[in-house]
């Protein structure tokens, strides 16, 4: 019988490069510049995470164009060790959940337009990449109150988005988008992870969600802004440390901590103050 304590893997950590302009998912992610059809950066998060193993670094090339698609870290494969963490290096990149609204999705009565998003509950309407001003309406308010929406504003009411504008939304590209998928970054059952230098915005629910079983996870110089519900939600038994963190201009919460979740923050900018839920 062989009993060994404190044994860790000696496999060398690698860097996997992701480039949403020049990358290709048939490549191996081993170089920042494309070499040939098989050697060079990958294009998507899914491909990078499929290649990744413990203690690796995923390096996002900041191309100036937002990355689309969510980033999901799960389990042993996307974890590290106390002295050799698994890393996501954003290099100032943006992860965006904005989804263009097809012109055919809009209906109108006069200058009041509406569309029905497939996913309900939290909404965000964007024009030219920026949130439009929102007009608040209660669900039980009568339909006549839709007339109170000011020009250039939008409101959500009974599963629809209403937007008042003189533009013809069903003709030409008005560059309108909604916050699309649920969360930009999801963390579950991971340990010894560092995520740094990126912005997460325009997701339907949360910029970052840690629903459970996370420990020794550090977010450094991360911005979560303009998401539908919260900049970040920590739930279950997750413990997240934030350093130079900014959670601002989100739909309802800057930081939502539920259950036994723990947030350890240093030099954080949160607007409004954090929400602690049972």
Over which residues does each language-model region extend?
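Extracellular polysaccharide-degrading/modifying enzymes targeting complex plant/algal/animal polysaccharides
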Residues: 17-210, 233, 256, 274-277
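Bacterial N-terminal signal peptides
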Residues: 1-6
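Right-handed parallel beta-helix
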Residues: 191-202, 214-229, 238-253, 261-276
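Boundary at the C-terminal end of the N-terminal hydrophobic targeting segment
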Residues: 11-13
